[in-house]
Amino acid sequence: MSFSERLLAAWYRGHPALALLRPLEALYRRVVNARRADFLSGRKPAYRAPVPVVVVGNITVGGTGKTPMILWMVEHCRARGLRVGVISRGYGARPPHAPWRVRPEQDAAQAGDEPLMIVRRSGVPLMIDPDRPRALRALLAEEPLDLVLCDDGLQHYRLARDLELVLIDAARGLGNGRCLPAGPLREPRERLESVDALLYNGADEDPEDGFAFRLRPAALVNLQSGERRALGYFPAGQMLHAVAGIGNPQRFFGTLEALHWRPIPHAFPDHATYSATELTFDPPLPLLMTEKDAVKCRAFAAADWWYLAVDAVPSPAFVAWFDARLEHLLAR
């Protein structure tokens, strides 16, 4: 287990040594609170776009199902007749310049794994740049849009936003409730009182303070051929190698077990890069990975490599709430 994996486990399961990091946590809290106060007070300017901006973000370190939820929002907005675009930091991307328009034919090293996955799945106009306001200006210069979704960026206060949605893993919650580096929180938990909605990934029903959503396995897709198969293609009891380089790989492995398969888990760091050698395991079995990992492996995939396509399914209450908020934002 790597240091980052051990630290993540300590944040969510508890460890007495974390008390040694509380002085650094106090400093971190002061810095992030002061930075947010500067933008809220107007001492530092924030870019206000001519179209509504919806931030879909995290308050915790680690995966919460943000990318599938953005894909759901893209399709939902399109079904309402809206022209929607996405901006992203492009974590791990190395484009020739920034801002950079992500295209389906690009590779993950250039575009970033999550932006490339979003574009290949949906075809949505998407611009990456660590400077979110610059990404948004560039996207609007190329596309006539009604609405922009900001992938992550909850803490990027240089970009004014009209709606803030925060995703939380229902099983892990906020961990020990402490800020970095003593805990997994990017901002103090009080920050959640000011966001517009909390969405709990994996909750069985809507909690009192937010909405539930789940990730529904949809299909098996072959990396080499693009062939799409129903989940029943792998029978119950099928042994397979399971690869996950995401924020919470155990959620992926648990999903495979819930489908009555027998995964041999291979967890990698979030946003990991791969080679064919790294993904050659014994015994020889089908290999199943996340869609986010698949965009980095298609060029060297073997014939029995697959990814599990998943769809976000929000609760009916959230869909109704989101539609009402969209109607309000677009009427202004």
From Swiss-Prot:
Task: Tell me, in a sentence or two, what this protein's role is.
Answer: Transfers the gamma-phosphate of ATP to the 4'-position of a tetraacyldisaccharide 1-phosphate intermediate (termed DS-1-P) to form tetraacyldisaccharide 1,4'-bis-phosphate (lipid IVA).
What's a single GO BP term from this record?
Answer: lipid A biosynthetic process
Q: In which pathway does it act?
A: Glycolipid biosynthesis; lipid IV(A) biosynthesis; lipid IV(A) from (3R)-3-hydroxytetradecanoyl-[acyl-carrier-protein] and UDP-N-acetyl-alpha-D-glucosamine: step 6/6
Q: List its EC numbers.
A: 2.7.1.130
What's the family?
A: Belongs to the LpxK family.
Quote one Gene Ontology molecular function term.
tetraacyldisaccharide 4'-kinase activity
Lineage, uppermost ranks = Bacteria, Pseudomonadati, Pseudomonadota, Gammaproteobacteria, Pseudomonadales
The GO cellular component terms are: plasma membrane
Question: Pfam families recorded for this chain?
Answer: LpxK (PF02606)
Question: Looking at the keywords, is Kinase present?
Answer: yes
The name on file for this protein is: Tetraacyldisaccharide 4'-kinase
Taxonomically, which superkingdom?
A: Bacteria
The UniProt catalytic activity note for this protein reads:
a lipid A disaccharide + ATP = a lipid IVA + ADP + H(+)
| Residues the record lists as binding ATP | 60-67
Q: Keywords of this protein's UniProt record, alphabetized?
A: ATP-binding, Kinase, Lipid A biosynthesis, Lipid biosynthesis, Lipid metabolism, Nucleotide-binding, Transferase
| Matching InterPro entries | LpxK, P-loop_NTPase
